[in-house]
Swiss-Prot record:
Residues 1-41 form a transit peptide. One of its GO terms (biological process) is chloroplast organization. SUPFAM superfamilies: ClpP/crotonase. This is ATP-dependent Clp protease proteolytic subunit-related protein 1, chloroplastic. The gene is CLPR1. Belongs to the peptidase S14 family. It comes from Arabidopsis thaliana (Mouse-ear cress). Induction: Repressed in darkness. Accumulates during leaf senescence.
Length: 387
């Protein structure tokens, strides 16, 4: 009986004694040195209540460090506004990659400062990064062993004193056009016709009182295997443009003038059709490649070939002064002519001479200086009538 009355009390006292005597070292994270509070039994403290003493609720946390545009209802508008302010080249980058652009001393910013209008110009690229001259991992001596072009850039093969010229090359097509020179140097295909016709029209508009020089080095519409690679009608378009221009057209055979190219040579102004001493001229009839198809298609091609042949003979007769019957008889088979023979046949008038007064001498230094004075260093704006 006595034991039953004393046991609960003793156990309770022993439990409180243990709780009160179990002391922890002092810590800045705890207010007291005791593990359990003396006024509340350890077993009666709920788990949730004890956890609430360690962590603050979400309502008690401060939002001062969050910008106002990202709080509550303004979150969506703030995010969209921030998104619009970010450059497009930041899209898809992580924070580390963005730092490369946003840091003042970033490698991207340092590289961007070096990129100027002058540094990306063609002149700067020619002077500092021209071809094999800038081969990575090689010095000038090593690069010179690999290419003769480096020696030519430096002014020849001998000596180390000669340096590569520090001036950019001229714009050759523009210089030739300024000198009123047109060059036919490939088979007569649509792209060639388009360029030549455009040049003739511009030069005739620019100054119809000055002559136009047409240099020819073309196999015409056929290659060395007598295969058709060009178009006969393209040559007739050039011929009609020559007749249309008010400017006189001086023609020069500077290599070869075969087929339709020989016809264009003969259409130059009489007395100003020249051939180089070792140039060659050849006359041949138009032809079509082997083809197959319906009978009506073959008949149409045959009629087209007859028409092209008639035009060719007619234009040759106009240029040479011979009758169409004689020309038709002469070119039943290809007719090959050297320089003097072409003159005798009436296709040309003389052998080209560097002292010929008909070829105007040009001051290229003055031309370059004149072009540099133009706005933007380029060609002048087109007249209002051509826009």
């Amino acid at each position: 009986m006595a034991t039953a009355l004393v046991s609960p009390l003793t156990s309770q006292l022993n439990h409180e004694a243990v709780c009160s005597k179990f002391v922890l070292p002092k810590s800045p994270f705890m207010s007291g040195s005791k593990l359990f509070s003396s006024n509340m039994p350890c077993s009666t403290v709920p788990r949730r209540t004890r956890r609430s003493h360690c962590f603050a609720s979400a309502k008690d946390m401060s939002f001062d460090h969050i910008p106002k545009q990202f709080r509550g209802d303004n979150l969506k508008d703030g995010v969209m506004q921030n998104f619009k302010n970010v450059p497009q080249y930041f899209y898809g980058l992580n924070s580390a990659q963005m730092d490369m652009f946003m840091t003042e001393d970033s490698p991207v910013r340092r590289q961007a400062e070096k990129v100027t209008e002058e540094s990306i110009s063609s002149r700067n690229n020619y002077l500092n990064n021209g071809g094999i001259w800038s081969m990575s991992g090689m010095n000038a001596a090593d690069a010179r062993r690999y290419s003769m072009s480096v020696q030519m850039y430096r002014g020849g093969g001998g000596g180390g004193g000669s340096e590569r010229p520090r001036t950019a090359p001229p714009d050759l097509p523009s210089l030739l056009l300024d000198a009123r020179i047109c060059y036919l140097g490939m088979p007569i295909v649509p792209a060639v016709t388009e360029l030549l016709v455009a040049q003739f029209m511009w030069l005739d508009y620019d100054n119809p009182t000055k002559p136009i020089y047409l240099y020819i080095n073309s196999p015409g519409t056929q290659n060395e295997k007598m295969e058709t690679v060009g178009s006969e009608t393209e040559a007739y378009a050039i011929a009609d443009t020559i007749s249309y221009c008010k400017s006189d057209v001086y023609t020069i055979n500077c290599g070869m003038a075969f087929g339709q190219a020989a016809m264009l040579l003969s259409l130059g102004k009489k007395g100003y059709r020249a051939v180089q001493p070792h140039s060659s001229t050849k006359l041949y009839l138009p032809k079509v490649n082997r083809s197959s198809g319906a009978a009506i298609d073959m008949w149409i091609k045959a009629k087209e070939l007859d028409a092209n042949t008639e035009y060719y003979i007619e234009l040759l007769a106009k240029g040479t002064g011979k009758s169409k019957e004689q020309i038709n008889e002469d070119i039943k088979r290809p007719k090959y002519l050297q320089a003097q023979a072409a003159i005798d046949y009436g296709i040309a008038d003389k052998i080209a001479d560097s002292q010929d007064s008909s070829f105007e001498k040009r001051d290229y230094d003055g031309t370059l200086a004149q072009r540099a004075m133009r706005p933007g260093g380029g060609s002048p704006a087109a007249p209002a009538g051509l826009r």
